[in-house]
Amino acid sequence: MYDFDRTLCTKDMQDYSFIPRLNMTEDEFWKFSNELGQSEHMDSILAYMYAMVKMSRERNMPLLRNDLVEMGKNVEFFDGVKDWFKRISDFGEKLGMQVEHYVISSGMKEIIEGTEISKNFKSIFACEFLYDENGNAVWPKTDVNYTNKTQFVYRINKGVLDVANDVDLNRSMPEDSKRVPFCNMIYIGDGLSDVPCMKMMKAYGGYSIAVYRKKDSKVEDLLMKDRVDFIYPADYSENTGLDLTVKNIIRKMAVCGLLYDENHEQKKEILGR
C-alpha cells in the first residue's frame, strides 16, 4: 500500500499542471487552501478540494474529469518507481506470493488514474469529485483524509474494495476468511499524514516504511518513536535499501505462510481422524 504525493511522486500532484493552469504559484494556492481550512475549521482535504473548484470557477475554467486525468501525464516520479511494481511482483511470484499494489492517497484519484503507473494498482483509494450534467466538478464524492485512510486498510484486509459497500466492511468475518491478512501488508508513506496507517501496521503485525527526499529530525522521529519499522530515501531503484528491505519482508511473509499452512494441515489431519 502506498501514499502517493511525496511518496511515489516528487511533490503534491496539483503542483505539476493544475496550479500552473490557474496562473498561481504553488505557495499561493496552498496558502489559500490552508488558511481557508483554519479559518473555517474545515477538514484540510475538503478545503483544498473546495479551493480547486472555487479557483477554477473564478477564472471561468471548467474543472472536468478528463482534464484532471490528462494532468496525470505530467506527474514526475522518484527514481525507480516506474519499474518498481513489476519488479516486486515478479520477485514475490518466484516465492509463491501474489503481490498486489494499492494506493491510499489524500490526492486526486482522477490525476492518479492519468499517470503511467496507474495500471499497476489493484485499487486506487483517493479523493474524487462528483460531476454535474456538463461534466464540471461540483462536490467532493470521496474525501480521504489522514485518519480515515485506515478505513481503506480494512477494506483491503476484507476484500471489500467498493467504497459504497459499508455493510460487508462492517460485517464480522473470521480471521482466516479475510482476503489479505494484516501480517502480509506493507505500507509506504512519507510522513506525519501517514502515521495512522503506519501505526495500524505495527499494531496488527504488518510493516510500515517512511520514505524521504531529505532526511530530517521528523522522519527520524517516526523511527525512534516506533511509528515505522524502517526509513529510506525515496529511491525505488533495484538494490537500494528500500528495494532490498521490501524483498526481505516478502521473503519473511512467504516463510510465515508456509509455516501457517503446515500448522493448518496438521490440525485438519487431527480433526479428520
How should each PLM-predicted stretch be described?
Residues 1-133, 228:
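Alpha-helical substrate-recognition element adjacent to the catalytic core
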Residues 73, 79-102, 106-273:
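C-terminal cap/substrate-recognition subdomain and adjoining C-terminal extension
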